[in-house]
Structure formats: C-alpha cells, structure tokens
A protein has these predicted regions:
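Short hydrophobic/alpha-helical segments at membrane-entry points of transmembrane helices
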Residues: 113-121, 133, 183, 268, ...
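Cytoplasmic helix-loop-helix junction between adjacent transmembrane helices
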Residues: 120-160
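Central mid-sequence intracellular linker of multi-pass
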Residues: 15-22, 148-150, 175-263, 317, ...
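Cytosolic juxtamembrane N-terminal segment immediately preceding the first transmembrane helix
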Residues: 1-41, 50, 54
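Glycine-rich segments within core transmembrane alpha-helices of 12-TM secondary carriers
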Residues: 147-177, 181-193, 308-316, 416-426
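Conserved MFS/SLC helix-loop-helix module at the cytosolic interface between two early adjacent transmembrane helices
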Residues: 76-115
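C-terminal transmembrane bundle
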Residues: 39, 68-71, 109, 125, ...
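Helix-breaking motifs and short loop linkers at transmembrane-helix boundaries and internal kinks
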Residues: 41, 56-57, 88-89, 110-116, ...
Length: 485
C-alpha cells in the first residue's frame, strides 16, 4: 500500500464531525434563532408603515421605498459577510453582523426624519440579512450530505417563523405602543441572540477547526466550547488528525459572484430566484388586495399572513426529511458511492412538483381575489403558496451547499443576492402592474414567466453533473473538498 493510499484510508476512518447529535441540535437551534432576525426585521415592519408615514409626514410611496431598499441590501450584504465567514470564521462574523444590526435598531427607534429612516433601514438589513448565509455555512460545516437536507429543513423552518407571526407582533406593538416600539423589540431580541452566540456557539469553520477537534484561535473560542474541549475533545484527537483540517483560504469578496456565474449553479439560482420574486410579489400585494376586496381590518390582514407562514414552516420541515430519505435511497442504487451518484438527480428531481404547486396557487389566488370569491379560497392558496415556495427554496439551497461545500456561506450569499434583487424589483412593480392590467392578469403573467423559465431547471438536471465535474477537474482543491463531504 502506498503512502497516499494509507493516508486516504486513515482520513476516511475519521468522523466528518465530532459534534454529537445533541450538540448539532443545539447549534442548529442557535443559528435558526439568529436567522429569525432577518425575517422579523422585514415582516414586523409592514403593519407599521401607515403610522410611520403619518408620523414622519411623508407619502406611502416613500415609505414603501424603504422596503425596496431593505431588500436590495438584503441581497448585497451577504456577499461581504459570507466571504468573510468562509475564511475568518463563523463566530466572529456572526458577532460583527449582529452588532451592526443592534446599532441600526437603536437608531431607528430614535429616528426623527425620513432620511435617517431610509439610511438606517439599509444598515439594519446589512446586519440582519447575512444570518441566513452564515447559518447555511455552519450547516455545511457540521453535516454530511445524507443528513444535511433534514437539518436544512429545520433551519429554514425556524427562519420562516417570523413570516407567520412577524406581522401580528408588529401590528400589536405599533397599535398599542407606537411604531418605535417595533425597533425596541428588535433591539432586545437581537441582544439576546448576540448573548447566546457569544456564550454558546462553537466555531465550526473547517479550515480553522477541521472536524471540530482542532483548537481555533482565541477570538473564535466560546466559553461552552472551551469547557467541552477540556472535558471531551482531547481524548478524541491525536496528532495525525492534523491532516483533516483543510488549508486556510484567503478572503475572496468576489467569491459569491464567481459562484453565481458558474454554469453548474447559474441556472438553478436564477430559476429559484424567479419563483422567490413571484412569492414576494404576492406577499406584498396581499394586504392591499384583501382590504380592498374583502374590507378586512389590519388585525385580520395579519392573521391571513399566518396561513402563508404555516405553509412555509410545514413545507420546509417535511421537504428536508424527504430529501434525506430520497438521497439515501438513490445512494443505495449506486452502491453507496457518492462520487458516481449524480447529485442533481438526488436533489433536484422534485422541483417540478413544487414549481407546479406554486404556479397553480399563484394563478388561483389572483383570479379568486380578482372575482371576489369567498376569502377562504385565497387563504388556502396562500397556504399552498408558502408550502410550495419554501420547499423549492429548500431544495435549491441544499443542492448549492452540497456542490459548494467548501464555500457554503458564499454559495448561499450568491443565491440570496439574485433572489433579493429580483424580489426588490418585483415588489416595486407589482402595484403598478395590478393598476394597469388588474389582479387576475397580473398573476397570470407571473405564472407564465415561472412556467417559461422552468426550462432552466431542465438544463440544470441534464447538464449540471457534467458542468460540476469539469469545474472540479479544473479546481483540484474544490474536488478534494467535495470528496470529504
């Protein structure tokens, strides 16, 4: 046996991660808690918009511009933080982003004019939006392909909780204590999140700690990790484990852009981003449409959003479990050889189902609201839309982390960039579209666009494996990282 073969055999016997199931559960809970900040900061704000416009003496259109700007920075900021976390560590990046978020929330609670509101909402988005990409990076560090989708489903379900309850909390706070209380709530919530991360979350970046057995730099140590290391880690490690840790990488702020324009990811990202934009356009239009057609109150509008949130949470948990089951089933057909198994077949073959459900729910929602059909029908469509849309997002997110395992945060940031920019554009035009061609035809147009661009998914499934193998052949370090997943 050659020396290289012996080293490979030794490395293959090492666990991918030393974190136990209970420790993984704790880590996933923490990153899901952090990811809710982005959703809360976005959704809790909507019920307060009319009150803010009156208090600052500006038009509703100008207040709506703060929503568009928030989405733009929500797409841009993870490209910075994601690249940093892939090289400097997850913990320090989490702490930096949340400090920015807390400062913005305090400033927003004390803002006195529209200019301050607009600028600070952009800063707030810069701090909160990256928690999703960072969470995906942590999941890539501690999970294997066979279990990743299940954990991704739990993570996605946690971060979608604010979609369901954010508008309700925002409506109650702004109604009882004024719109500034919304930002004080976010300050307290964000402060609790920072405290948990500082005290508990361990560093997971594999280029720093390998499978978790290596001691990170002092600034990356958490008190809990230090205690666990003294109690458990030393007995599980030995000098030969050094080979497990990947070589450190330089920070590449263009990393997300490079991932975006890889042929083996561009089609998947653009495909799911269009579906995300359609989803956001429906979410943006719902409150105005149901008030006009069904004469609902603000509280009733907030309760309608619960249907979408419930569908999203249920969908992401179930699709994660299904993806793990399906992956293991297909892997058995290839004799357990992950290098021969086409990951596109294992991950993407259900996208047609979720896309079809989203298209049907958008179409029926549009026409039932347009014709004033009983409100229960659009509410059911709203539930199905949340289920289908987030299931599709979870499928693509898991796939991207699988094929860009060594740059998982950057890969998620590239997805976030495209879908947030398209979402910002969509939310800006949905109102004028409805005014121009009416509700039913607006959502018919959205459905048609999603159907036409379904060809991108077909291209990804047909050619993705060949493109990925070509990229790995041209980048030996990336290929080695994938082998170690």
């Amino acid at each position: 046996m050659s020396q290289s073969e012996a080293m490979t055999q030794v490395e293959s016997s090492k666990p991918y991660t030393i974190f136990t199931l209970s420790q993984k559960a704790l880590i996933v809970t923490i990153i899901s808690f952090a990811a809710t900040l982005s959703g809360f900061a976005s959704n809790i704000y909507f019920p307060a918009l009319p009150q803010i416009a009156d208090d600052l003496s500006v038009s509703t259109s100008l207040i709506n511009l703060t929503v568009t700007c928030y989405l733009i920075f929500q797409g841009l900021s993870p490209t910075l933080w994601g690249s940093l976390s892939d090289t400097k560590g997850r913990r320090i990046t989490y702490i930096c982003t949340l400090v920015v978020f807390l400062g913005a929330c305090i400033g927003l609670a004390e803002t006195r004019n529209y200019a301050q509101l607009l600028v600070l909402r952009c800063v707030q988005s810069t701090g909160s939006a990256s928690t999703i990409a960072l969470g995906a990076g942590v999941l890539g560090d501690i999970t294997t392909r066979e279990e990743r989708a299940g954990y991704m489903g739990i993570f996605q379900g946690g971060l979608l909780m604010p979609v369901a309850i954010g508008p309700v909390i925002g409506g109650v706070l702004s109604d009882k204590m004024g719109w500034r209380s919304v930002f004080w709530f976010l300050t307290i919530y964000g402060g609790a999140c920072v405290l948990v991360i500082v005290l508990v979350l361990p560093e997971t970046l594999r280029s720093m700690v390998g499978n978790g057995a290596e001691e990170p730099k002092r600034y990356a140590m958490s008190p809990l990790a230090l205690y666990q290391r003294k109690k458990h880690f030393r007995q599980d490690t030995n000098p030969s484990a050094e080979g497990e840790k990947p070589a450190p990488k330089r920070t590449d702020f263009l990393g997300p852009a490079k991932i975006l324009f890889h042929w083996n990811t561009f089609c998947a990202i653009f495909y799911v981003a269009v579906h995300y934009a359609a989803w956001q356009m429906v979410l943006t239009a719902v409150s105005v449409l149901v008030k006009q057609k069904y004469h609902t109150s603000e509280i009733q509008v907030g309760l309608i959003f619960l249907a979408n949130g419930a569908g999203s949470i249920i969908g992401t948990v179930l699709v994660g479990r299904f993806l793990d089951y399906d992956y293991r089933r297909i892997l058995r057909k290839y004799g357990g050889d992950e290098q021969r198994m086409p990951i596109e077949k294992a991950r993407l073959r259900t996208v047609w189902l979720w896309s079809a459900l989203e298209c049907v729910s958008v179409l029926i929602f549009g026409w039932t609201v347009d014709q004033g059909v009983h409100i229960s029908v659009p509410i059911i469509c709203f539930f199905v839309l949340g289920w289908a849309a987030i299931s599709l997002q979870s499928v693509i997110s898991t796939y991207l982390v699988d094929i860009h395992h060594t740059q998982s945060a950057s890969a998620t940031a590239s997805l976030n960039l495209v879908r947030c920019l398209l979402g910002a554009g969509g939310t800006a035009v949905v109102g004028p579209l409805i005014n121009s061609i009416h509700v039913g035809w607006t959502f018919t147009l959205l459905t048609g666009i999603m159907l036409v661009l379904g060809g991108l998914a077909l291209v990804q499934i047909m050619f993705g494996d060949a493109w990925r193998q070509r990229r790995e052949h041209n980048s030996p370090s990336e290929m080695e990282g994938q082998r170690n997943v």
